[in-house]
Amino acid sequence: MAVSLPPTLGLSSAPDEIQHPHIKFSEWKFKLFRVRSFEKAPEKAQTEKQDSSEGKPSLEQSPAVLDKPGGQKSALPQPAFKPHPKFLKESHEDGKARDKAIHQANLRRLCRICGNSFNTTGHKRRYPVHGPVDGKTQVLLRKKEKRATSWPDLIAKVFRIDVKADVDSIHPTEFCHNCWSFMHRKFSSTPCEVYSPRNAAMEWHPHTLNCDICHIARRGLKRKSQQPNMQLSKKLKTVIDRARQARQRKRRAQARISSKELMKKIANCGQIHLSPKLLAVDFPAHFVKSISCQICEHILADPVETSCKHVFCRICILRCLKVMGSSCPSCHYPCFPTDLESPVKSFLSILNTLMVKCPAKECNEEISLEKYNHHISSHKESKETFVHINKGGRPRQHLLSLTRRAQKHRLRELKLQVKAFADKEEGGDVKSVCLTLFLLVLRARNEHRQADELEAIMRGQGSGLQPAVCLAIRVNTFLSCSQYHKMYRTVKAITGRQIFQPLHALRNAEKVLLPGYHPFEWQPPLKNVSSSTDVGIIDGLSGLSSSVDDYPVDTIAKRFRYDSALVSALMDMEEDILEGMRAQDLDDYLNGPFTVVVKESCDGMGDVSEKHGSGPVVPEKAVRFSFTVMKITIAHGSQNVKVFEEAKPNSELCCKPLCLMLADESDHETLTAILSPLIAEREAMKSSQLMLEMGGILRTFKFIFRGTGYDEKLVREVEGLEASGSVYICTLCDATRLEASQNLVFHSITRSHAENLERYEVWRSNPYHETVDELRDRVKGVSAKPFIETVPSIDALHCDIGNAAEFYKIFQLEIGEAYKNPHASKEERKRWQATLDKHLRKKMNLKPIMRMNGNFARKLMTKETVEAVCELIPSEERHEALRELMDLYLKMKPVWRSSCPAKECPESLCQYSFNSQRFAELLSTKFKYRYEGKITNYFHKTLAHVPEIIERDGSIGAWASEGNESGNKLFRRFRKMNARQSKYYEMEDVLKHHWLYTSKYLQKFMNAHKAFKNSGFTINLQRSSGDTLDLENSPESQDLMEF
């Protein structure tokens, strides 16, 4: 008797005679003795177990199978028909899915970082790869001030593994306790060695037939192999798999529906969110779905977007993540509250413009979603009263005694009203509305002190310092950015208040003070200079075409563009200029023209080598070019009125750096290559006028440049003259050394930049076909092309240094009585020097130096020093000569040292000619052994040219290079402070910091800060010493202010 199969099995097309009677039993037997490799994934098994518990018996639970013996075999012949190709394909795909599920189950037992199995490690603890860090790690990171808050960031920082792009089917989702311990040891300060669990990152691949992970998992346990049932039909297997898949799809659909209902219950937002049914327009279903929350299916309220690009209401997604775990409710991709972001603005604008119907009765108004809350609150105001009536129960607490959460709950209605008002009237500025309301309440209750403090905070002038004050403190105390940031964090952590401003606020304040911020214009435009005004620090070598044939320039140079730097300097002095105009009874609206006199200085520095920084091999010497705004006048009527004059022209606080280069000043080619563009800008500015808006009015400025801050070595270099040992002794006149020694006093200034250029052309072309000596005598020592125009003058500082060096030599010769023995040996002269050094150290506390400097010269040139030296000289006659020589020198010195000799030392100025002639007479008689037929360069300039320069310029000391020399000390200090890995950036830091140090705007803040700081101390200086406290603005005095 044939047994007919049900049509659902797919065999109804086969005739009854070929169907075996024991097919049903064979199916049960296959289910009972199924091979291990055909087992289902754990998730499917659990689902089937749940279904079976609901009262749906499966084949395994059938009592008929349990009664049969296990060893019974059926003789089922091979079926005479082929299975349908569709069934074979579905069976193959089901096998693939089953293998993938087994692969994922194996992955869950492995560590994502090191690949070890959780079963082999000693600890059973696991940590999610995509989760936030645990409490212990968070405490450790907070101590170390690290910003990482999630495991992906921490794993990327420690192991250099990016887990954000992981896929669950390829990568494990957890890591082991060993890797967790490794990260802890990495960030903890315990003195133990840290070993990485792996030398290289673990590589994970998709599942394949020869998958290593599944192969190792199968090899774990040995089972007795079972003989496959050869009588089982492939067609029956396909039929069973299809039935199983149908059941699984049904269960998944039911689970999906139940999970969606569960999420709606968790969100519980029916009272606060709007249903899509309230939309005024009947939109397509897809559009409604796109603007609806995928959890509660309401219109999106305060929408947020996950990393997998699904959009939810903020309240709904946060509640679901808290209850159901850290995964997206739509796609189950890992998701955390920190990953939520606001959608794009275009989507929000579309959402806010949707029109919805008002759900209130007797209101048929349609309003936009953006104004819905304000509209609904207007309905509530008419019905509700704000006076709370306590109807018994728990007593009502005061607002200030509540927790923050309870305060939010109680003030929720008020907060919504304030927000609606701010959105409507103040552009959404809720903070300003609340602060103003609080301020009005304080004023109404006569609490004006608190009101004044609140008003200061609202204006940004609270208890903290202004960014400009903080910048002034940082610059004047020589703090680098990193040092200031450490101080800022320390003060904020200790006091709990933000007294100092963060670095980004200081950088915004810097931009206003640095060149390249203020717009300006030149009339006519500068020749060969760009018209752009936003030019900051530029490379000093920019514009140089470097080729194989060119001279190799091994240097690093950074500079400002000359015109941009002058504009920044003038804007920095804006208050001083306007105040000067008011002091001269001039109107503020006068637009000029103003005439600005600029002193230029340039000097070389030796031994600036540093042992750090990458970059090219550059000379261990530097050259600095700087300028000082000396005087500003305005044309008023027929005269020029002075509105500004630099009070301390030789201070480093007013000597602004323009160009820094690591080069040797003796390297003529490098010097001309870097300074030539700067000189070209200077020459272009001479014939043009600057149009600059100052005080809201467009004003005109003209510039006069005076190159006086050069020592004699650099003057000879840039004016094309021979070196200092030349026969032509002077840079101001054509006298030779012999002529100057025979005529010590009566000379006049004859040299000029134009004349030097003409003489260079004669030297180059030799038009008269003369010999070298004749040609040299004709051009008076000009041997190179002059490229910088300098003013024929004397540098007061180097004049002091040169004259002190000569007096130091005279002291040695007098100790050895060289007037008796002019041909002494070198050993004797060294002995005289050693005797002098020892005596000066003992009597005057002057330590011997290798090279004369300004401080040593200042201490050496005194009457006390002469008296000490006279103790070593036996002859009384020589005592008198030496004392008279020093006395004459000390009478002449104030004339070239003072900024305005006509006011400061008029008597010395009147007697200068007499004193210089007497000084020259002493040199030619009493000290004839030293000055017969020769004289030093600075003695010649001191005796012959000082009165003429004073008559022409009014001063020598004010135009000296002392400010630039002090700037050299600042350069060394800034270079140590701003040590960087790259020498290029280091030079930029030094130039920028030095420019800020010379800012008058910052100096005013710093002076006010000093005065405020000193006002807290009661120091009676007159009672203690009777002297005034002299705090000079120099790097040495600034050491007192270091933090």
Swiss-Prot record:
A GO molecular-function annotation: ubiquitin protein ligase activity
Which family does the record assign? Belongs to the RAG1 family.
Q: How does it assemble?
A: Homodimer. Component of the RAG complex composed of core components RAG1 and RAG2, and associated component HMGB1 or HMGB2. Interacts with DCAF1, leading to recruitment of the CUL4A-RBX1-DDB1-DCAF1/VPRBP complex to ubiquitinate proteins and limit error-prone repair during V(D)J recombination.
The yes or no answer to whether the keyword Flavoprotein is present is no
Q: Which InterPro entries match?
A: RAG1, RAG1_imp-bd, RAG1_Znf, RAG_nonamer-bd_dom, Znf_C2H2_sf, Znf_RING, Znf_RING/FYVE/PHD, Znf_RING_CS
Origin organism is Sus scrofa
Cellular compartments per GO CC: DNA recombinase complex; endodeoxyribonuclease complex; nucleus
Quote the subcellular location field of this record: Nucleus
Residues involved in crosslink (Glycyl lysine isopeptide (Lys-Gly) (interchain with G-Cter in ubiquitin))?
A: K234
Name of the molecule in the record: V(D)J recombination-activating protein 1
The residues annotated as site (Essential for DNA hairpin formation, participates in base-stacking interactions near the cleavage site) are W896
Could you tell me which residues form the DNA-binding region?
A: 392-459
User: Any notes on this protein's domains?
Assistant: The RING-type zinc finger mediates the E3 ubiquitin-protein ligase activity.
